Amino acid sequence: GMYMSGFFPCMMFGIPGAALAMIQTAKTNKRKATIGIVGSAAVCAFLCGVTEPFEFSFMFLAFPLYVVYALLYAIFATVTVALGYRAGFCFSAGLTDAIFSSFLPAANKTLLLIPMGIAAFVVFYLVFLFAIKKFNLKTPGREDDQEGELNIELANDDYTAMAQIILEGLGGKDNI
């Protein structure tokens, strides 16, 4: 559990902090979509410890930010070992494994997860916020607008027009 312990504060608290930074820096016309993508990925990471939806949302758009993200994981892994927090996991470091692993005989100082988690949330949030703004990183919701993208409204009742747009996006009738 010693080397697994560092994942808990990062997955359960750090990722939601980073997600909040991404949501706040998203363009206003893309904020709802960003909340849906990044927010649901953060909930998934917190509850289950499944981080891939969150990581894949930005690792190809802003690779330098992914490097920073990996370094934050390393820092928090070091801190958890130094503080003596011990918790293992069966699947991944989400809430479900945090609850179950806290009852294992090898678990140690399990309540430290709360203050470490709060610290991880704040650190991930501030680092992501700074990096995204300072280096104008293209995280979800900040990517360049495509021509014609702004003309599409999701609440459009003209289903024929929507079907035509979807058909064009799939390569036309001949492609289907």
Predicted regions and their residues:
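Structured cytosolic domains appended to multi-pass membrane proteins
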Residues: 157-175
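A broadly tuned "polar low-complexity/structure-edge" signature
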Residues: 36-41, 176
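Short linear motifs at secondary-structure transitions and domain/linker junctions
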Residues: 20, 33-34, 44-45, 163-166
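Transmembrane alpha-helical segments and their short flanking loops
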Residues: 1-3, 15-24, 40-41, 47-156
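Membrane-proximal intracellular helices of multi-pass ion channels
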Residues: 28-37
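Residue-level signature of catalytic and energy-coupling elements of molecular machines
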Residues: 49, 175-176
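Structural signature of hydrophobic alpha-helical transmembrane segments
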Residues: 4-12
